[in-house]
Regions:
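Class I SAM-dependent methyltransferase SAM/SAH-binding core
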Residues: 32, 40-92, 97
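A short, conserved alpha-helix within the catalytic core of class I
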Residues: 118-131
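Conserved S-adenosyl-L-methionine
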Residues: 35
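Conserved beta-strand signature within the Rossmann-like core of class I S-adenosyl-L-methionine
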Residues: 138-147
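Core SAM-dependent methyltransferase catalytic element
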Residues: 189-209
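Conserved Class I S-adenosyl-L-methionine
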Residues: 154-178
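Class I SAM-dependent methyltransferase Rossmann-like catalytic core
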Residues: 1-27
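A conserved beta-strand element that flanks and buttresses the S-adenosyl-L-methionine
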Residues: 111
Length: 209
């Protein structure tokens, strides 16, 4: 049997993120995950949050078969097969796919981990705009990853990581929290909660103003 792609970082952070999610979210609901990658988070969260229906997605069609295999192997009734979703596309999910015919389906939560710093800045605006369209009233957008903050000394590891990202792609880089929250406000979302996480990461919760 071919081994599935594995992210050590996803294994390290999945439990701290889950602990935060269980404090933030209600007992049941529906969640859309953006940039699911290997699907490790989707499986871990869906297994622990059995009353949440979890929809994983990714913008890279090449990762979907392996993610689908991991999800099928998990055999969780509340975890759906992955879909192709590019936040920059005018429709979520992307052209040619649908949420089982529910093209305008909305969610109680949208979750996006480790995407904003490894994609162009335009994806931040697209994420906020799409979340505003796809969230139910009272719903939340939850993002996770490294951020720079005004008046908060940057961790040396994050400074080095940012330099490495920008050397690899000039459009990448750790984002300033103030810029992200300003972009969210343009779409009617405001920062509700900020949670410090291990390894100098933050988990942010946005909701409607």
């Amino acid at each position: 049997m071919t081994s599935l792609p594995h992210s050590p970082a996803a294994d390290r952070n999945k439990q701290p993120i889950l602990d935060a999610l269980t404090r933030i979210l209600g007992e049941e609901g529906s969640a859309l995950e953006i940039a699911s990658g290997t699907g490790q988070h989707a499986v871990w969260f869906a297994a622990a949050m059995s009353r949440w229906n979890w929809q994983p997605t990714d913008a890279d069609a090449r990762v979907l078969p392996a993610m689908a295999s991991r999800i099928a192997e998990a055999a969780l009734p509340n975890l759906r097969p992955p879909l192709l979703l590019d936040v920059m596309a005018p429709r979520w999910p992307s052209e040619g796919f649908a949420f089982a015919g529910e093209e305008e389906k909305k969610f109680d939560a949208i979750y996006c981990a480790n995407m904003l710093h490894i994609s162009p800045w335009a994806t931040c605006a697209a994420l906020m705009q799409g979340a505003a369209r796809r969230l139910l009233p009272g719903g939340v957008l939850i993002t996770y990853g490294p951020y720079f903050e005004e008046e908060v000394p940057a961790a040396p590891s994050n400074i080095g990581f940012d330099e490495d990202l920008r050397a690899r792609n000039a459009a990448w880089g750790i984002r300033r929290l103030e810029d992200v929250t300003a972009e969210a406000r343009k779409s009617g979302l405001t920062l509700r909660e900020r949670h410090a996480m291990p390894a100098n990461n933050l988990l942010l919760v946005f909701g409607f103003q």
